[in-house]
Amino acid sequence: MHDIKWIRDEPVGLITALVRRGGGSDEAKSAAEKLVAYLIGLDEQRRRTLTDLEGKLARRNAASKEIGQAKAQKDEERASRLMAEVANLKADIPTLEALAKDWEKSLDNALAAIPNAPLAEVPPGADEHDNVEKSRFGVARSYAFTPKQHFEVGEALGQMDFETAAKLSGARFVVNKGPLARLERALGQFFLDVHTGEHGYMEVNPPLLVRDDAMFGTAQLPKFREDQFFVNTVDGIEAISAETKGFETFSDEFKSKLTEAMSYQGRWLIPTAEVPLTNLVRESILSEEELPLRLTACTPCFRAEAGAAGRDTRGMIRQHQFTKVELVSITTPEKSAEEHERMLACAEAVLKKLDLHYRVVTLCTGDMGFASQKTYDIEVWLPGQGAFREISSCSVCGDFQARRMNARYRPAEGKGPRFVHTLNGSGVAVGRALVAVLETYQQENGAVTVPDALLPYMGGLKTIEKLK
C-alpha cells in the first residue's frame, strides 16, 4: 500500500507510476490524474475532519476545567453556560469520530486497490510480448523422435490420471501415482534441501488456511478475491446466511455484511506460501541484526484460476491445486535490490542442477504483478510443447506489503522504526518442474530417465517405466 504522505507531497510520482503500468497511453494518464485527485480529496476531507475533531476535544477538555474554576468562583451563570457548551461538544464528537473513521476507511480502501510503483529500470510495455530476456541457460535438446507433452508421457506410463481426478474434484486436478508420485515428492524435497542446505533459507511448515488480514497483507485481497478459494464450516455458512438475510443480493449493504461475516467465520486457502511466510513478520518490529530473514516452505497451493478459461485445459500446467516451494526474504531498503538478484540465483540453481534449459526474462511494466516493483520470471523449456513456460517468478515489493502488514525493523544506529522490504519467489513450482522433467528426460520407448540430482531421493530407481 502506498504512503498517502508521499502521494500528497509528490502526486506526480504516483501518476507516473500508474501511467507506466498502463502502457503510457493518454487514457492511462487521464485515469491516473483523476485517481490521484480523488485520493488527495479523500485525504483532505479526512484531515479536515480530524482537525475539527481534535479542536472539539481540546475545547471540551478546556471547558470542563473552566467549569470547575467558575464553580470555585461562585459564578453559576458562567458554569451553566460552560456545561451547556460541553454537552453540545459531547453530542458533536461521536458524529465527528464516526465521520473520521468513514473517511479513513474510504481512503484505505482506495489505496488498497492501487498497484505498486515499478522501479525505474523496469522495461516499459503492455503485456508479456514486451518482456525482456535477461539470460539463458543451456540449449534445447535434440531428439531422434518427436517429443511428447507431459500428459501424454504420464498417461502412457499409467501414472498420471486426470479422468479419475475429475471424478473426485472436477477439472484442473490430477492424480499422480507410483514412481511418478515419488518423483514429484523428490523434486519438492530436493528443492528444500538445496535452499536450506546451500542457500541459507530456514524451512517453515506454515498453515494452509489464513485469515483476511494475512491475504490483505500480501495484497491477494481485495484485488484478487475472485481467484481465491474460501472455506468455512457448515455452522459458519449458516451464520453468514443469517447475517446477510434481508439485504438485497449484491447491494452495497449485502456486500458489506457478507465481507464482515466471511472475515469473522471463514478462512482462505493459500494461493502461495508467500502469504503465511511473509505475514510471519506482520505487526512486529525486528532488529536490523535479524535481517535478512530468509524463509522457505513446500506447500500445496490453491487457485481458482478465474481468468484462465480456455487456457492450458489439458495437463498439469494450470491447476486448482499444485505444490510449490516458495522463497521469501525480509530485508532492509538498502539491501533489497541485492537480495532480489540473490533470490533469482537461488531459484536458477535448482534448475541448473536438474540440467533443464531455461531463460530469465524481466517483466515489463504492463505484465508485472500487483504488489511487485520489479519481477524476473524463469521460463523452462518444454520440448513437448516446443515453448518456454514460467516455472518461477521472483519479485521485489519494496515496502508495499510491509505497510499493509505494519512490518518494521529498528535500524542499528538507533533511529526510529522503518518499514522492511519484502521479496518473494518460486524456488520452484514442483508441478511444473515435474512437467519439465517428464518432457526433457523422456525416452523413445516412453520411459523417463531420472535426473542425476534426484537419484538420492528415488530409492535406487533410475528409470520410470510403464506400470505392469
Curated annotation (Swiss-Prot):
The keyword Aminoacyl-tRNA synthetase applies. CDD domains: SerRS_core. It comes from the Bacteria. ATP binds at residues 303-305, 390-393. Its main location: cytoplasm. Pathway: Aminoacyl-tRNA biosynthesis; selenocysteinyl-tRNA(Sec) biosynthesis; L-seryl-tRNA(Sec) from L-serine and tRNA(Sec): step 1/1. Transmembrane segments: none annotated. Belongs to the class-II aminoacyl-tRNA synthetase family. Type-1 seryl-tRNA synthetase subfamily. This is Serine--tRNA ligase. One of its GO terms (biological process) is selenocysteine biosynthetic process. InterPro entries: aa-tRNA-synt_IIb, aa-tRNA-synth_II, aa-tRNA-synth_II/BPL/LPL, Ser-tRNA-ligase_type_1, Ser-tRNA-synth_1_N, SerRS_1_N_sf, SerRS_core, tRNA-bd_arm. Consists of two distinct domains, a catalytic core and a N-terminal extension that is involved in tRNA binding. Keywords: Aminoacyl-tRNA synthetase, ATP-binding, Cytoplasm, Ligase, Nucleotide-binding, Protein biosynthesis. Homodimer. The tRNA molecule binds across the dimer.
